[in-house]
Design a protein with these regions (language model features):
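Bacterial Sec-dependent N-terminal signal peptides
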Residues: 1-22
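N-terminal "domain-start" segment that seeds a small globular fold
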Residues: 19-40, 124-125
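Short, internal strand/loop/helix patches
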Residues: 23-24, 96-146
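Amphipathic alpha-helical repeat scaffolds
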Residues: 31, 51-55
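Conserved helix-turn-beta segment immediately C-terminal to the redox Cys motif
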Residues: 45-46, 55, 59-83, 103-106
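Thiol-based oxidoreductase modules, predominantly thioredoxin-like and allied folds used
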Residues: 76-93, 108-120
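Thiol-/selenol-based redox modules, centered on thioredoxin-like
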Residues: 125-128, 132-180
Length: 180
């Protein structure tokens, strides 16, 4: 009986460790136009993951995000935007409407993914990993509002997050991007 409990404990521990060992690169998401986008294609790049919305007081951050992307995209850095309608209905549009909004209003050229949920029962698997310590191995970081920013290193590891109201040009983000 003792051997059985030891086996079960070892199995639970190994499954827990396997979940923590999952990397950003293990996920595949969909682009705003519906194509599969394996995040493994970003190996070797620092990635800033941001949940975005077009009818939020923080929506002007799109301009800063684009400026940040333009400034660092040639230095193994990329931004990925995930439209989400989780906060007061501030992203009500379809994927097509969101893509048009980003292009017309902010000339966004960084990748925008298909609309997802970033909290609640229908939370996207990637956002479970981004927000749960038991999965990312680092920290619980529930999404507080639109434009929360998650930093992923060149090896697909969770580095940290920046609160929604903080500028994409915050010292935390810039020093992380520029760190060699």
């Amino acid at each position: 009986m003792k051997a059985f409990f030891s086996f079960v404990a070892a199995l639970v521990l190994s499954l827990s460790m396997a979940a923590q060992n999952k990397s950003f690169y293990d996920f595949t998401v969909r682009t705003i136009d519906g194509k599969e986008y394996p995040l493994s294609g970003l190996k070797g790049k620092k990635v800033l993951v941001v949940n975005v919305a077009s009818k939020c007081g923080l929506t002007p951050q799109y301009a800063e995000l684009q400026e940040l992307y333009d400034q660092y995209k040639d230095q193994n850095f990329v931004i990925i935007g995930f439209p989400a309608n989780n906060f007061m209905g501030q992203e009500p549009g379809t994927n097509e409407e969101i893509a048009k909004f980003c292009s017309v209003n902010y000339d966004v050229t960084f990748p925008i993914m298909a609309k997802i949920s970033v909290k609640g029962k229908d939370m996207a698997p990637l956002y479970h990993w981004l927000t749960e310590k038991k999965l990312n191995g680092k920290q619980d970081a529930p999404v507080q509002w639109n434009f929360q920013k998650f930093m992923i290193d060149e090896n697909g590891n969770w580095v940290g997050f920046v609160a929604p109201k903080e500028s994409p040009f915050s010292e935390t983000i810039i020093s992380w991007i520029e760190k060699k």
